[in-house]
UniProtKB/Swiss-Prot annotation:
Protein name according to UniProt: Photosystem II reaction center protein L
SUBUNIT field: PSII is composed of 1 copy each of membrane proteins PsbA, PsbB, PsbC, PsbD, PsbE, PsbF, PsbH, PsbI, PsbJ, PsbK, PsbL, PsbM, PsbT, PsbX, PsbY, PsbZ, Psb30/Ycf12, at least 3 peripheral proteins of the oxygen-evolving complex and a large number of cofactors. It forms dimeric complexes.
Organism per entry: Huperzia lucidula (Shining clubmoss)
Classification via InterPro entries: PSII_PsbL (IPR003372), PSII_PsbL_sf (IPR037266)
Role: One of the components of the core complex of photosystem II (PSII). PSII is a light-driven water:plastoquinone oxidoreductase that uses light energy to abstract electrons from H(2)O, generating O(2) and a proton gradient subsequently used for ATP formation. It consists of a core antenna complex that captures photons, and an electron transfer chain that converts photonic excitation into a charge separation. This subunit is found at the monomer-monomer interface and is required for correct PSII assembly and/or dimerization.
Compartment annotation: Plastid, Chloroplast thylakoid membrane
NCBIfam families referenced in this protein's UniProt entry, alphabetically: PRK00753.1 (NF001972)
Membrane topology type: Single-pass membrane protein
Transmembrane parts of this sequence: 17-37
Domain of life of the source: Eukaryota
Keywords, in A-Z order: Chloroplast, Membrane, Photosynthesis, Photosystem II, Plastid, Reaction center, Thylakoid, Transmembrane, Transmembrane helix
Amino acid sequence: MTKPNPNKQSVELNRTSLYWGLLLIFVLAVLFSNYFFN
């Protein structure tokens, strides 16, 4: 299980999870705003 550059891979993984977290927060914000404004 040796990879050429494990540090780069972990950074890519963290960035991807960060984007998913921001997307989830955005979706929740839209749902809550729709709930409160209706």
